[in-house]
Amino acid sequence: MNMKKLPVDVSIAKRRTILMLCAASLTFAAMTACKSGTREKAAAEPPFADTIPICFETDWGHAGAGGIFCSVEINGVKVDTVLVDNGCYRSDIDPDLAAKLDFTYRVYRTDTLRAKRGSEELADIARYSVVTDSLCYKIGHTSFRLDTIDINKWAALMYSMPSLGATIGRDVFEKYVVEIDLQRHFMVLSNHLPASIGQYKAIPMEFTNQQGFPRFRCVQTDGFRLKDGAPCTARVFLDLGNAAGTAFDSAFLNRVDQHFSQIDTSSLAWLILSQIGSAVDSMNFPIELMDDNHRVVAKIPGSMMDLSVLNSDILLGTDFFRHFNVIFDYKNNMLYLKHN
């Protein structure tokens, strides 16, 4: 009897050993997967010093024609309304003013934005001159001249906002590679181009510092024609700070003697699709939305432009960039587009 029971006992012991080994293996696998997942999660969240993610909350542009408001946390303080403006200065301000006057922009301390709202100290701009994380977040606009501001009106404007706002202006674009995806509501400031840059269409930008002209980077295009067949060249300016009435809802033509009724819409469509929209092989932009009734024509005095060089300027704003992931590399004067 005992000889017959022995194999059974050995079999049970073996089964227990196998079960224990299986359990240990499963535990080890789970721990490994957990660690791997932690590493993957960490890899997906680059360090703040290298890349700064900013999430958009609201597209405010069509309400105020000023840009895009979003939410960002700086030094632990949440700024609810941050106006993104990648290059447009106020037209009544000399763009070279800062250099001529050795002008120093003054900036609110971002870590005291909340504390100072609603107090008399809000009007004391000079007390909060600081550059935070090298980003130069600015209240209001990148190029406001302090000597032209009625500080009482300015304070009243700030009180009327949902919360204090700061401008991510052209100075930020000059320092960082800026990636923006309007469709998914995010922006990233980085010290380098992303690893996925090979998926983007690279488009060289031109830099112009023409006095009196508010925008400084553009894409030079040819093949643009009027209805009478006359050829035109055009500078396509890229301005995320001007959201209302741009791109396919309208475009801004700054030629003094030219109106949209004179422009061959199919030629304009070809211009945009072939030279800007060539980021992908096939595009389906709503060209039919280019209704003359919704277009805005901005006329600038001829003395401010060299019309022998420039026939027309087209301003592409937020409406256009909704169709793309866009990367601005101002240091190298490059624009990258990928259809989203």
Model-derived regions: residue spans:
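Pepsin/retropepsin-fold aspartyl endopeptidases
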Residues: 34-340
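Bacterial Sec-dependent N-terminal signal peptides
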Residues: 1-48
